[in-house]
Curated annotation (Swiss-Prot):
It is found in: Secreted. SMART domains: NH. The lineage of its organism: Eukaryota, Metazoa, Chordata, Craniata, Vertebrata. Belongs to the vasopressin/oxytocin family. One of its GO terms (molecular function) is neurohypophyseal hormone activity. Keywords: Disulfide bond, Secreted. It holds the Pfam family Hormone_5. The gene is AVP. This is Neurophysin 2. GO terms for cellular component: extracellular space; secretory granule.
Length: 92
């Protein structure tokens, strides 16, 4: 079994590669917000062909999602607003 620590970050995506893929049609970045089902997220479909699992985002949220941008929690298929993702996002 692989621990969370060993999962690589998903592919970069979006303007300037500043986002990360969170699902096959979801690209999010701290400064970008989230693109769902748009051209910015097309690259994320490439993850389907890569053998190793990936996980973007630092902080878990909801039931099995990850904080993707300020106030946004993303799952593989969709994103929802999530107040707990506002707090200290990206600050360690």
């Amino acid at each position: 079994a692989m621990s969370d620590m060993e999962l690589r970050q998903c592919l970069p995506c979006g303007p300037g590669g500043k986002g990360r893929c969170f699902g096959p049609s979801i690209c999010c970045g701290e400064e970008l917000g989230c693109f769902v089902g748009t051209a910015e997220a097309l690259r994320c479909q490439e993850e389907n062909y890569l053998p190793s699992p990936c996980q973007s985002g630092q902080k878990p949220c909801g039931s099995g999602g990850r904080c993707a941008a300020a106030g946004i929690c993303c799952y593989e298929e969709s994103c929802v607003t999530e107040p707990e993702c506002r707090e200290g996002a990206g600050i360690h």
